[in-house]
């Protein structure tokens, strides 16, 4: 699943999910969490932007959200039989991309949203992979993939995407970096609530015959990731604004497009960075002569080129990636597709035939996690993420850690992911209903503790009872003023969204407060 799965265990988890109160539903995940129901098939998912983020945060490195339902964590690579699967959770926001994971319970209103913004450090780990993967999954689409499919068909049913498309702000920079590095046979995403297929032919790009449009977002990538003020909050896409209609790939006939669902309510009442002024005549400038007299410390630091698209390493040889996004679940919607996937990754030895495959750790990925474990900080907005030192720095470190993984985990036969799910938070109590006050406490997940112990890395997610209680008594940090409700139509958890791109009353007046049922 590519999500939003909304892995809500109880009513308090709903208070940590970026969905307006009047649209919240408990759903049925809690039944799988409690064991009342079981999934018929192994299910793997990444996180999106409508999640019980406090629950998924317990499983930052990946783990079982419920029996048979495996969350990939913020970023991950796992194996399932002959397949090697990479995943990246969250959605793009240039403002938060290079920040640390500063959110920690109890959350303020801005934390509830920023916690699911993908971070550069997590993306950086994926960019160290040097061998082929078969499948990549993300919630947000990789930026630029829209140019490789039926773009006109997409814009016919999602016309509000055109502004972001023309300004190079559509979709995820992080997912594109991962896609271009990993080049899997398949990449699956969700987020826009529409079926869309595309093909990325890297052989054309290497020969210089690729689409010129692919280069357009690349410049914007560097602008988004290097500037502290993004033009707007790029991840907040009008998913339901025009009603949800499946869009076909280039090969599909146009008559399969259905009329829009006018009764559907948009839930992405998210923060938007204010559009910058187009004119900057009032900003004072400094002459180059005066700049030359300043000490070297006043010079602008060189741009970080680590996000530049580099040639793939020899171990990544696939040239064709098939991209597929599906609609959200619902009647007469294209939300399910069955595919036969032929592995393109190489294995040192063929796996013996098995009736059922079990998830396994990935040797290279575990080595990467050991290299980067000390760089992870939690709950501190003032912390600085260590800079990207580039592949030449990380490669020998990763190779050394691979030798450790081989000796300590591969050879002893410890690479199968244990089915060690345990309840942490209480299960849902229907007698209490869903409108409960307060946020849940923080839980130290035994799966994360076991994983960190296995890898012999620090576990910053574990806190003593005294630390948890002290944070709860202190309460949330002061809120970011961008998220204080009432100052404009999209503020906080208040207001509706109109069909126009305007702010304030236009957005709130057109769709807000109509009492329509929310469709996920």
Model regions and ranges:
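Extended recognition/assembly regions associated with phosphoester-bond processing machinery
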Residues: 1-520
């Amino acid at each position: 699943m590519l999500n939003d799965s909304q892995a809500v265990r109880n009513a308090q988890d709903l208070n940590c999910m970026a969905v307006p109160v009047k649209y919240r539903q408990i759903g049925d995940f809690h039944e799988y969490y409690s064991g009342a129901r079981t999934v018929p098939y192994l299910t793997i998912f990444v996180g999106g932007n409508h999640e019980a983020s406090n629950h998924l945060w317990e499983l930052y490195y990946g783990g079982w959200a419920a029996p048979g339902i495996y969350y990939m964590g913020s970023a991950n690579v796992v194996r399932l039989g002959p397949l090697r699967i990479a995943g990246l959770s969250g959605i793009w926001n240039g403002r938060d991309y290079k920040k640390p994971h500063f959110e920690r319970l109890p959350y303020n209103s801005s934390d509830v949203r920023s916690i699911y913004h993908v971070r550069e450090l997590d993306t950086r780990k994926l960019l160290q992979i040097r061998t082929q993967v078969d499948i990549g999954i993300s919630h947000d689409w990789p930026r630029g993939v829209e140019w490789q499919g039926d773009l006109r068909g997409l814009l016919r049913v999602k016309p509000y995407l055109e502004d972001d498309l023309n300004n190079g702000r559509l979709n995820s920079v992080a997912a594109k970096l991962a896609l271009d590095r990993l080049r899997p046979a398949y990449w699956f995403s969700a987020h826009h609530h529409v079926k869309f297929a595309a093909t990325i032919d890297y052989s054309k790009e290497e020969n210089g015959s690729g689409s010129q449009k692919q280069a357009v977002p690349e410049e914007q990538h560097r602008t988004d990731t290097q500037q502290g003020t993004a033009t707007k909050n790029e991840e907040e896409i009008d998913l339901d604004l025009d009603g949800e209609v499946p869009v076909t790939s280039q090969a599909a006939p146009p008559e399969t497009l259905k009329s829009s669902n006018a009764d559907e309510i948009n839930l992405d009442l998210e923060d938007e960075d204010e559009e910058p002024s187009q004119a900057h005549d009032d900003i004072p400038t400094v002459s180059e002569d005066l700049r030359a007299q300043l000490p070297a410390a006043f010079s602008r630091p060189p741009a970080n080129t680590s996000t530049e698209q580099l040639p793939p390493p020899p171990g990544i040889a696939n040239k064709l990636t098939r991209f597929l996004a599906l609609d959200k679940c619902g009647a007469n919607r294209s939300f399910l597709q069955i595919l036969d996937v032929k592995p393109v990754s190489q294995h040192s030895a063929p796996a013996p035939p098995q009736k059922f495959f079990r998830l396994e750790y990935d040797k290279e990925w575990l080595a990467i996690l050991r290299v980067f474990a000390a760089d992870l900080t939690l709950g501190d907005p003032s912390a600085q993420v260590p800079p990207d030192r580039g592949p030449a720095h990380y490669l020998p470190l990763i190779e050394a850690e691979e030798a450790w993984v081989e000796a300590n985990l591969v050879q002893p036969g410890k690479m199968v992911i244990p089915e060690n799910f345990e309840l942490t938070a209480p299960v849902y109590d229907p007698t209490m209903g869903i409108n409960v006050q307060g946020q849940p406490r923080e839980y130290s997940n035994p799966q994360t503790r076991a994983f960190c112990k296995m890898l012999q890395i620090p576990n910053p997610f574990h806190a003593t009872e005294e630390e948890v209680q002290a944070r709860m008594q202190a309460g949330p940090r002061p809120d970011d003023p961008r998220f204080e409700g009432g100052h404009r139509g999209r503020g906080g958890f208040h207001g509706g969204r109109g069909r126009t791109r305007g702010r304030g009353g236009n957005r709130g007046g057109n769709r807000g407060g109509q009492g329509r049922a929310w469709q996920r």
